[in-house]
Curated annotation (Swiss-Prot):
The keyword DNA-binding applies. It is found in: Nucleus speckle; Cytoplasm; Nucleus. Interacts with CALM, EP300, HDAC3, KPNB1, ZNF208 isoform KRAB-O, PARP1, SLC9A3R2 and WT1. The interaction with EP300 modulates its DNA-binding activity. The interaction with KPNB1 is sensitive to dissociation by Ran in the GTP-bound form. Interaction with PARP1 impaired its DNA-binding activity. Residues 24-53 are annotated as: Disordered. GO terms for molecular function: calmodulin binding; DNA-binding transcription activator activity, RNA polymerase II-specific; RNA polymerase II cis-regulatory region sequence-specific DNA binding. Belongs to the SRY family. GO terms for cellular component: cytoplasm; nuclear speck; nucleus. This is Sex-determining region Y protein. It holds the Pfam family HMG_box.
């Protein structure tokens, strides 16, 4: 009642049905015909995404290296594309102006054809996306030391403190300089600075802040 379909006939029918579809969708991005290089190519990511982007006309080096690249690739199948480009660049520099001149003429002809075909063409290079800068500041390490100088009696006295808790204590010390005797205050501050350095190795920042707020500076009479 149902005819038996031969597997060879089925395979041939599938191939005939797929060949036209493949021929309509496939294309070569680069051919030996110079005019084919002006075809529109699909754009990548960015503003040209989903639209057709026109290629730039070839310059003299591109015209010369079009055949040379293929020749070098056939002679050295294991050579990478980056190495081939370096070799072609070196060979191009070694050519004389007379040897380069035919390729400059061909490049000018291709540029004239490009202007006629795309009169409104403007070269818009794709810019790399810049990394976004974070507004968050990295926390300072507990071992980082900040230095500051205080003017007492026309002399600068350096003070070293750790973390924000010690900074607040030194700020209170600086405020007291305006209403106290300069020499006595300087001696007291130097004594407390020596005390802070000896206790900073074993005390945590929280304990050090509590200790500084509980011990006001000593003013000898």
């Amino acid at each position: 009642m149902f005819g038996v379909l031969n597997s060879n006939d089925h395979r041939a029918a599938v191939q005939q049905r797929n060949i036209p579809a493949f021929g309509r969708t496939s294309f070569e991005p680069w051919t030996d015909n110079p005019t084919s290089n002006y075809r529109c190519e699909p754009g990548g990511n960015g503003r040209d995404s989903g639209q057709n982007r026109v290629r730039r006309p070839m310059n003299a080096f591109m015209v010369w290296s079009r055949d040379q690249r293929r020749k070098v690739a056939l002679e050295n199948p294991q050579m990478q594309n980056s190495e081939i480009s370096k070799q072609l660049g070196y060979q191009w520099k070694m050519l004389t102006e007379a040897e380069k001149w035919p390729f400059f003429e061909e490049a000018q002809r291709l540029q004239a054809m490009h202007r006629e075909k795309y009169p409104d063409y403007k070269y818009r290079p794709r810019r790399k996306a810049l990394p976004q800068k974070s507004d968050k500041l990295l926390p300072a390490a507990s071992s980082s030391m900040l230095c500051r100088q205080v003017l007492v009696d026309e002399k600068w006295y350096p003070f070293t403190y750790r973390d924000s808790c010690s900074r607040a204590a030194h700020s209170r010390m600086e405020d007291q300089l305006s209403s106290s005797q300069p020499v006595n205050i300087a001696n007291s501050l130097l004594q407390q600075e020596h005390h802070y350095r000896s206790t900073s190795l074993r005390d945590s920042p929280e304990t050090l802040a509590t200790h500084l707020s509980a011990d006001p500076p000593f003013y000898p009479k």
